[in-house]
Amino acid sequence: MAELSEQVQNLSINDNNENGYVPPHLRGKPRSARNNSSNYNNNNGGYNGGRGGGSFFSNNRRGGYGNGGFFGGNNGGSRSNGRSGGRWIDGKHVPAPRNEKAEIALFGVPEDPNFQSSGINFDNYDDIPVDASGKDVPEPITEFTSPPLDGLLLENIKLARFTKPTPVQKYSVPIVANGRDLMACAQTGSGKTGGFLFPVLSESFKTGPSPQPESQGSFYQRKAYPTAVIMAPTRELATQIFDEAKKFTYRSWVKACVVYGGSPIGNQLREIERGCDLLVATPGRLNDLLERGKISLANVKYLVLDEADRMLDMGFEPQIRHIVEDCDMTPVGERQTLMFSATFPADIQHLARDFLSDYIFLSVGRVGSTSENITQKVLYVENQDKKSALLDLLSASTDGLTLIFVETKRMADQLTDFLIMQNFRATAIHGDRTQSERERALAAFRSGAATLLVATAVAARGLDIPNVTHVINYDLPSDVDDYVHRIGRTGRAGNTGLATAFFNSENSNIVKGLHEILTEANQEVPSFLKDAMMSAPGSRSNSRRGGFGRNNNRDYRKAGGASAGGWGSSRSRDNSFRGGSGWGSDSKSSGWGNSGGSNNSSWW
């Protein structure tokens, strides 16, 4: 990665920062050799998927090992996760035998790059500051052990090649084990998914399912009674969480399902009718299934809101409140509620009062900021020179995957077609592509069949794609928080990454925030950005939550917020964070409206 950063530095794209970008044909030197792929076929799809054409990536239905199953009833004191899962018999967890083929499908092999678990800088997380506030904060764990974790979960964690807990996992495991609610802010890429899956599954493996009410109708009218419900703002993130859940529920009695809009509801209904113990869902589709009477929340022990600030920013608050407050959800105090996100400004914390009880507030790392594992470069490039500058960047990069962000769906298609014509293996993901096309594009990118992914905001938030070594902001966003989330797609789980941004006079609204981000992360600030900042109007960075300042990760109860007072322990080592941002919308499957989001409709 250091070599790639040096190559970018030596590209002569900014020989003189004040003069801006110098096109290759004016530099007095030949164009760099480009990455060729003679096996690429641009007919009927290829790596780009043809925007509706054929593709060699099959659209397999989600599910995989352990999701076949029968309807999970409470028959004779036993519970089974289908033919391939474990069983809960007379108060005891009986794991299924190990299956070599299933383990390869779920966990890969050690040298498989698609199953990246940790990077060369993972030990650096030991030095990340942590602030845990609330009553009687449990001591954090320092390693994966039993107790407090269940033995079967430990085996699955070992299969996934996780060797040590991240800071958020060190705290979340004992917090959940002690029956407490949790609001957690953690640096992007720092293991938030494991932060809620590990403790929730561990406790579920120990305590088993709740008894289900007797069926009120025929088999096809039965409801699913999940023990855990995880809500996420987008179908891509929901699918990603589900894929992780399949790994860690391996051989257990817990059957995981995922539901989201944009895909036929029939397949999802059939999976749910076979039994569902852990449900991952987007708010719109979950509301739809509740209205259809296919799901009951009466047995929910664990409610998880992932990217909670984003869901509220996207206008999902009415849906979430309906799910939590108006349906048959287990009430506050009788369930455990966990809220996870990269940012939690004060207004979201105030809303959390309605969903959490006696919770512990956890801030890990420089939340809402950029990882120091990411080397950031800002280049001055006029719009007409961007394609040429991009080719130079790509020619300097030979290893890993590159994620390129643009602002519009039209530009995503145009740039992808341009890159394909230059013999790069590129694909695109944006809102006009169908769900199956998006899944095929992501599968191609994850596997390395396509080394370039051109994306609108779809891939900007929450997705964990291994081996992304370079993020290029071809078009800078208007909000600095979106910039942070975009570049957070690299440098994840302790790995190093490079982020390059094309900047010009049209990006004046992000000048101050970008300067602040670079300075905060000890990155080089180019002179043209300093000059632009001096001339930019106003004094506050453009952030949709800028009104709450830079310290929005703080527990508002410490600052005299509602319910403040009487809060004892605090393991504080740092404070200084930023707010979130929002865009997108959920599925059209529900009658619930969308009130938030940005002008970019790329989610759909």
Curated annotation (Swiss-Prot):
The keyword Nucleus does not apply. ATP binds at A186, Q187, T188, G189, S190, G191, K192, T193. PROSITE patterns: DEAD_ATP_HELICASE, HELICASE_ATP_BIND_1, HELICASE_CTER, Q_MOTIF. A motif (DEAD box) lies at residues 306-309. It catalyses: ATP + H2O = ADP + phosphate + H(+). SMART domains: DEXDc, HELICc. Residues 1-19 have a biased composition (Polar residues). This is ATP-dependent RNA helicase DED1. It comes from Saccharomyces cerevisiae (strain YJM789) (Baker's yeast). The gene is DED1.
